[in-house]
Amino acid sequence: MDIGRSFAYITEDQEWWKKVLLGGLISLIPIVGQLYVLGYVLETLKNVIAGREVPLPEIGDDFGGKLIKGLLLWVITFVYFLPLTLLSTCSGVGSPIFTEIIDDPDAVGAVIGVWSGCFGCLSLVVGIVVGLLLPFAWSKYAETDQLGEAFKLGQIFGMLKNNIGPAIIVLLVNGLAGLAAMIVGSILCGIGLIFTFFYAQLVTAFLYGALYNKAKATVL
């Protein structure tokens, strides 16, 4: 995988600045704008997987189609993060229950601390696993346009198992891209965040596509 190109490929498009500008502005539209941007990122991912020299699609084309794909991509992401949401809910529920059934304040504090610590560690592990699986789920949907492909966990775990090293690298680089977007966007008077985060999403699309192309041959 060419990690460096995941940041540079965007500027290889002659109209990259216009696409990043418009993408950032569209993301300001509540709900609809964010879903469209997700659909745009998905189409970029599809183009990366297909090996197109200039993967960035045109901004504004097939608005409805990208909107629907963005919604479905949101559904995929929501389902994958559902276990993490449930763990967080269980962690929060424990505090009032223990406060109600235990009279000793010190004991309550200790029990809640252990409870929260255990769920915190478990949530961290689950979050990392989800972060490692998501590139393959997104990519399978992007390549096939079939929602069910994103939930073929046997194939997805097989890809991850045979490409655990590259998957970890993608997870780390993706996190760094998000951090860089936050720092640079904040420096640009805050408003720059909408453009730097959109840029970071396009970096994610390339990373996911490159990882998926590397992993495809490992699953029949």
Locations of the language-model features?
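Small-residue hotspots
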Residues: G23, L84-L87, S91-S95, S116, ...
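Membrane-interface segments at the starts/ends of alpha-helical transmembrane spans
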Residues: W17-K18, L22, D106-G120
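Membrane-interface interhelical connector segments
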Residues: T99-I112, F151
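Interfacial aromatic "cap" segments that immediately flank transmembrane helices
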Residues: D2-S27, I59-L86, L133-I183, A210-L220
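Selective recognition of hydrophobic, aromatic-rich stretches within alpha-helical transmembrane segments
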Residues: S27-A50, V111-A150, M182-V219
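Selected alpha-helical membrane-embedding segments in polytopic membrane proteins
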Residues: V32-V93, I97
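Short helix-capping/hinge motifs at transmembrane helix termini and TM-loop junctions
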Residues: G92-S95, T99, D103, E143, ...
